[in-house]
Amino acid sequence: LPGRSQFGAGSTSTGVRETNIVCPGPSAMSKAEEAKKLAGRAAVENHVRNNQVLGIGSGSTIVHAVQRIAERVEQENLKLVCIPTSFQARQLILQYGLTLSDLDRHPEIDLAIDGADEVDADLNLIKGGGGCLTQEKIVAGNASRFIVIADFRKDSKNLGDQWHKGIPIEVIPMAYVPVSRTVTQKFGGVIELRMAVNKAGPVVTDNGNFILDWKFDRVHKWSEVNIAIKMIPGVVDTGLFINMAERVYFGMQDGSVNMREKPF
Protein backbone atom coordinates (compact mmCIF):
# COMPACT_ATOMS: atom_id res chain seq x y z
CA LEU A 1 0.00 0.00 0.00
CA PRO A 2 1.25 3.52 -0.71
CA GLY A 3 3.25 5.06 2.10
CA ARG A 4 3.58 1.81 4.01
CA SER A 5 6.60 -0.40 4.35
CA GLN A 6 6.20 -3.75 2.64
CA PHE A 7 6.30 -5.56 5.96
CA GLY A 8 5.77 -2.53 8.22
CA ALA A 9 3.31 -2.16 11.05
CA GLY A 10 1.15 0.80 11.93
CA SER A 11 -1.88 1.61 14.04
CA THR A 12 -5.27 3.15 13.41
CA SER A 13 -7.06 5.77 15.46
CA THR A 14 -8.95 2.96 17.22
CA GLY A 15 -5.74 1.34 18.44
CA VAL A 16 -6.02 -1.55 15.98
CA ARG A 17 -2.55 -2.56 14.80
CA GLU A 18 -2.05 -3.20 11.09
CA THR A 19 0.61 -5.15 9.21
CA ASN A 20 0.88 -5.47 5.43
CA ILE A 21 2.27 -8.69 3.97
CA VAL A 22 3.08 -8.88 0.25
CA CYS A 23 2.16 -12.19 -1.38
CA PRO A 24 2.64 -13.63 -4.88
CA GLY A 25 0.74 -12.04 -7.76
CA PRO A 26 -2.86 -12.92 -8.60
CA SER A 27 -3.80 -16.05 -10.54
CA ALA A 28 -6.65 -16.45 -12.97
CA MET A 29 -9.13 -16.35 -10.08
CA SER A 30 -11.30 -13.31 -9.55
CA LYS A 31 -9.63 -10.74 -7.31
CA ALA A 32 -12.05 -11.43 -4.48
CA GLU A 33 -11.56 -15.19 -4.64
CA GLU A 34 -7.80 -14.82 -4.85
CA ALA A 35 -7.94 -12.45 -1.87
CA LYS A 36 -9.84 -15.06 0.15
CA LYS A 37 -7.18 -17.63 -0.69
CA LEU A 38 -4.34 -15.31 0.32
CA ALA A 39 -5.97 -14.46 3.65
CA GLY A 40 -6.73 -18.07 4.47
CA ARG A 41 -3.24 -19.29 3.67
CA ALA A 42 -1.60 -16.44 5.61
CA ALA A 43 -3.61 -17.24 8.74
CA VAL A 44 -2.76 -20.94 8.52
CA GLU A 45 0.94 -20.24 8.02
CA ASN A 46 1.10 -17.86 10.98
CA HIS A 47 -1.04 -19.69 13.53
CA VAL A 48 -1.45 -23.41 12.90
CA ARG A 49 1.02 -25.52 14.88
CA ASN A 50 1.49 -29.20 15.67
CA ASN A 51 -0.77 -30.86 18.27
CA GLN A 52 -3.47 -28.20 18.12
CA VAL A 53 -7.22 -28.52 18.43
CA LEU A 54 -8.63 -26.32 15.66
CA GLY A 55 -12.07 -24.79 15.26
CA ILE A 56 -13.01 -24.81 11.57
CA GLY A 57 -15.39 -22.06 10.47
CA SER A 58 -17.95 -22.03 7.68
CA GLY A 59 -18.34 -20.25 4.36
CA SER A 60 -16.44 -19.79 1.12
CA THR A 61 -13.26 -18.27 2.58
CA ILE A 62 -12.63 -21.10 5.05
CA VAL A 63 -12.30 -23.56 2.16
CA HIS A 64 -8.92 -22.07 1.29
CA ALA A 65 -7.72 -22.29 4.89
CA VAL A 66 -8.72 -25.95 5.13
CA GLN A 67 -6.93 -26.70 1.87
CA ARG A 68 -3.73 -25.22 3.28
CA ILE A 69 -4.16 -27.01 6.61
CA ALA A 70 -4.43 -30.32 4.73
CA GLU A 71 -1.31 -29.51 2.70
CA ARG A 72 0.66 -28.77 5.85
CA VAL A 73 -0.58 -31.92 7.58
CA GLU A 74 0.75 -33.96 4.66
CA GLN A 75 4.00 -32.01 4.26
CA GLU A 76 4.89 -31.62 7.94
CA ASN A 77 3.08 -34.62 9.46
CA LEU A 78 1.15 -32.32 11.79
CA LYS A 79 -1.12 -33.89 14.38
CA LEU A 80 -4.30 -31.80 14.42
CA VAL A 81 -7.87 -32.28 15.60
CA CYS A 82 -10.65 -30.28 13.92
CA ILE A 83 -13.97 -29.14 15.41
CA PRO A 84 -16.57 -28.09 12.79
CA THR A 85 -18.98 -25.17 13.08
CA SER A 86 -21.50 -26.53 10.58
CA PHE A 87 -22.40 -29.45 8.35
CA GLN A 88 -20.38 -27.74 5.59
CA ALA A 89 -17.31 -27.50 7.83
CA ARG A 90 -17.72 -31.13 8.86
CA GLN A 91 -17.79 -32.22 5.23
CA LEU A 92 -14.71 -30.10 4.47
CA ILE A 93 -12.79 -31.73 7.31
CA LEU A 94 -13.70 -35.19 6.04
CA GLN A 95 -13.08 -34.28 2.39
CA TYR A 96 -9.50 -33.26 3.13
CA GLY A 97 -8.78 -36.23 5.37
CA LEU A 98 -8.39 -34.24 8.58
CA THR A 99 -9.20 -35.60 12.03
CA LEU A 100 -12.80 -34.81 12.97
CA SER A 101 -13.86 -34.32 16.57
CA ASP A 102 -16.40 -32.37 18.63
CA LEU A 103 -16.72 -30.29 21.78
CA ASP A 104 -17.73 -33.32 23.83
CA ARG A 105 -14.29 -34.84 23.32
CA HIS A 106 -12.31 -31.62 22.91
CA PRO A 107 -14.05 -28.79 24.81
CA GLU A 108 -10.90 -26.64 24.80
CA ILE A 109 -9.89 -25.30 21.40
CA ASP A 110 -6.44 -23.84 20.76
CA LEU A 111 -7.30 -21.87 17.63
CA ALA A 112 -10.49 -21.09 15.72
CA ILE A 113 -10.32 -19.77 12.15
CA ASP A 114 -13.43 -18.39 10.47
CA GLY A 115 -14.61 -15.87 7.92
CA ALA A 116 -16.82 -12.81 8.35
CA ASP A 117 -19.44 -10.92 6.40
CA GLU A 118 -18.11 -7.58 7.69
CA VAL A 119 -15.42 -6.32 10.06
CA ASP A 120 -15.48 -2.84 11.60
CA ALA A 121 -12.59 -0.65 12.75
CA ASP A 122 -12.68 -2.23 16.24
CA LEU A 123 -12.68 -5.79 14.84
CA ASN A 124 -16.33 -6.35 15.69
CA LEU A 125 -17.94 -8.70 13.19
CA ILE A 126 -21.17 -9.48 11.44
CA LYS A 127 -21.35 -13.22 10.76
CA GLY A 128 -24.09 -15.63 9.82
CA GLY A 129 -24.64 -15.01 6.13
CA GLY A 130 -24.37 -18.77 5.76
CA GLY A 131 -26.75 -19.45 8.64
CA CYS A 132 -24.19 -21.04 11.00
CA LEU A 133 -23.79 -18.18 13.46
CA THR A 134 -24.65 -20.02 16.68
CA GLN A 135 -22.21 -22.89 16.17
CA GLU A 136 -19.59 -20.44 14.94
CA LYS A 137 -19.96 -18.35 18.09
CA ILE A 138 -19.82 -21.42 20.34
CA VAL A 139 -16.58 -22.60 18.75
CA ALA A 140 -15.00 -19.13 18.70
CA GLY A 141 -16.04 -18.56 22.30
CA ASN A 142 -14.33 -21.77 23.42
CA ALA A 143 -11.09 -21.06 21.56
CA SER A 144 -7.98 -19.59 23.14
CA ARG A 145 -7.45 -17.61 19.93
CA PHE A 146 -9.98 -16.56 17.31
CA ILE A 147 -8.56 -15.54 13.93
CA VAL A 148 -10.69 -14.15 11.10
CA ILE A 149 -9.98 -14.35 7.38
CA ALA A 150 -11.71 -12.20 4.78
CA ASP A 151 -11.29 -10.43 1.47
CA PHE A 152 -10.99 -6.67 1.01
CA ARG A 153 -14.75 -6.21 0.50
CA LYS A 154 -15.46 -7.08 4.15
CA ASP A 155 -13.36 -4.27 5.65
CA SER A 156 -15.50 -1.39 6.99
CA LYS A 157 -15.17 1.55 9.31
CA ASN A 158 -18.65 0.90 10.71
CA LEU A 159 -20.85 -2.17 10.53
CA GLY A 160 -23.29 -1.71 7.68
CA ASP A 161 -20.95 0.31 5.47
CA GLN A 162 -20.26 -2.63 3.15
CA TRP A 163 -22.64 -5.37 4.27
CA HIS A 164 -26.26 -4.49 3.48
CA LYS A 165 -28.01 -7.80 4.16
CA GLY A 166 -28.44 -7.10 7.85
CA ILE A 167 -27.48 -8.79 11.10
CA PRO A 168 -28.63 -12.41 11.30
CA ILE A 169 -30.59 -13.48 14.37
CA GLU A 170 -31.22 -17.18 14.96
CA VAL A 171 -34.63 -17.76 16.55
CA ILE A 172 -36.86 -20.59 17.71
CA PRO A 173 -39.42 -20.97 14.88
CA MET A 174 -42.50 -20.19 16.99
CA ALA A 175 -40.94 -16.91 18.13
CA TYR A 176 -39.96 -15.33 14.83
CA VAL A 177 -42.91 -12.91 14.66
CA PRO A 178 -42.71 -11.59 18.26
CA VAL A 179 -38.92 -11.35 18.05
CA SER A 180 -39.21 -9.38 14.80
CA ARG A 181 -41.70 -6.97 16.38
CA THR A 182 -39.63 -6.48 19.53
CA VAL A 183 -36.37 -5.80 17.69
CA THR A 184 -37.87 -3.25 15.30
CA GLN A 185 -39.82 -1.52 18.07
CA LYS A 186 -36.69 -1.16 20.21
CA PHE A 187 -34.05 -0.48 17.57
CA GLY A 188 -35.81 0.44 14.33
CA GLY A 189 -34.91 -0.92 10.92
CA VAL A 190 -36.57 -3.76 9.04
CA ILE A 191 -36.52 -7.50 9.72
CA GLU A 192 -37.03 -10.22 7.13
CA LEU A 193 -37.42 -13.95 7.64
CA ARG A 194 -34.66 -15.52 5.55
CA MET A 195 -36.22 -17.65 2.83
CA ALA A 196 -34.61 -20.70 1.26
CA VAL A 197 -33.50 -20.73 -2.37
CA ASN A 198 -33.90 -24.38 -3.32
CA LYS A 199 -36.80 -25.31 -1.04
CA ALA A 200 -40.20 -23.82 -0.33
CA GLY A 201 -40.30 -21.85 2.89
CA PRO A 202 -37.69 -20.41 5.23
CA VAL A 203 -34.07 -21.35 5.75
CA VAL A 204 -33.74 -23.90 8.55
CA THR A 205 -30.43 -23.89 10.42
CA ASP A 206 -28.41 -26.95 11.42
CA ASN A 207 -30.10 -26.52 14.81
CA GLY A 208 -33.62 -26.60 13.35
CA ASN A 209 -34.23 -22.88 13.82
CA PHE A 210 -35.12 -19.88 11.62
CA ILE A 211 -32.93 -16.91 10.65
CA LEU A 212 -34.10 -13.30 10.81
CA ASP A 213 -32.07 -10.69 8.93
CA TRP A 214 -32.27 -7.33 10.71
CA LYS A 215 -31.48 -4.44 8.36
CA PHE A 216 -30.68 -1.70 10.84
CA ASP A 217 -31.01 1.96 9.84
CA ARG A 218 -28.35 3.58 12.03
CA VAL A 219 -25.13 2.86 13.92
CA HIS A 220 -25.73 1.48 17.41
CA LYS A 221 -23.65 0.64 20.46
CA TRP A 222 -23.31 -2.91 19.28
CA SER A 223 -22.27 -4.47 22.58
CA GLU A 224 -25.47 -3.17 24.19
CA VAL A 225 -27.67 -4.11 21.25
CA ASN A 226 -26.21 -7.61 21.14
CA ILE A 227 -27.04 -8.24 24.80
CA ALA A 228 -30.51 -6.71 24.50
CA ILE A 229 -31.48 -8.84 21.50
CA LYS A 230 -30.16 -12.01 23.11
CA MET A 231 -32.41 -11.35 26.12
CA ILE A 232 -35.57 -11.46 23.97
CA PRO A 233 -37.40 -14.76 24.56
CA GLY A 234 -36.98 -17.02 21.55
CA VAL A 235 -33.64 -15.63 20.40
CA VAL A 236 -30.90 -18.26 20.23
CA ASP A 237 -28.04 -15.91 19.28
CA THR A 238 -27.07 -13.03 17.01
CA GLY A 239 -24.54 -12.64 14.24
CA LEU A 240 -22.78 -9.88 16.18
CA PHE A 241 -19.34 -11.03 17.34
CA ILE A 242 -18.22 -8.32 19.76
CA ASN A 243 -14.63 -8.20 21.07
CA MET A 244 -14.02 -11.80 20.02
CA ALA A 245 -11.56 -11.57 17.12
CA GLU A 246 -7.89 -11.31 18.01
CA ARG A 247 -6.63 -10.81 14.46
CA VAL A 248 -8.15 -10.34 11.02
CA TYR A 249 -6.36 -11.14 7.77
CA PHE A 250 -7.69 -9.25 4.75
CA GLY A 251 -6.66 -10.42 1.31
CA MET A 252 -6.23 -7.28 -0.77
CA GLN A 253 -6.76 -6.48 -4.45
CA ASP A 254 -3.04 -5.93 -5.04
CA GLY A 255 -2.09 -9.44 -3.90
CA SER A 256 -1.03 -8.44 -0.39
CA VAL A 257 -2.52 -9.46 2.94
CA ASN A 258 -3.36 -6.77 5.48
CA MET A 259 -3.30 -8.04 9.07
CA ARG A 260 -5.11 -6.10 11.78
CA GLU A 261 -5.10 -6.90 15.46
CA LYS A 262 -6.44 -5.39 18.65
CA PRO A 263 -4.08 -4.88 21.58
CA PHE A 264 -4.97 -6.98 24.61
From Swiss-Prot:
Its EC number is 5.3.1.6. Pathway: Carbohydrate degradation; pentose phosphate pathway; D-ribose 5-phosphate from D-ribulose 5-phosphate (non-oxidative stage): step 1/1. The modification Phosphoserine is found at S60. SUPFAM superfamilies: D-ribose-5-phosphate isomerase (RpiA), lid domain (SSF75445), NagB/RpiA/CoA transferase-like (SSF100950). Gene3D superfamilies: 3.30.70.260, 3.40.50.1360. The keyword Phosphoprotein applies. Keywords: Isomerase, Phosphoprotein. Residues 1-20 are annotated as: Disordered. The keyword ATP-binding does not apply. It is an enzyme of class 5 (isomerase). This is Ribose-5-phosphate isomerase. It comes from Bos taurus.
